[in-house]
Amino acid sequence: METTTLTVGRNIKDSGTVTNQMLEQFINDEVLTRLEYATITHGMGIYKGTMEAIVCISVSDDKNEDVLFEVGEAYKKQFRQDAVMYSCDMREVAFK
């Protein structure tokens, strides 16, 4: 099974950060309307030498890869991001 992950940073160039309220609204408007299920993980990352809070949105099926690209493009536009990161891992996963 394939797991695709969208990783986004919460810094906004020259404008502070994506707040929890802004992130929750984005998830409600852009993620929940497009995905039936996903795993959302919060963490820290480094982009261009700067540490920042990140959010990873992962799905474990091949059908939703394009949906994550749409979500990533929406995030880039809404929060003026230079880039978002997509990663794909092949794993054996069982839902029991």
Question: Which sequence ranges carry the predicted segments?
Answer:
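Positively charged, small/polar-rich N-terminal and surface patches that mediate targeting and assembly
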Residues: 1-96
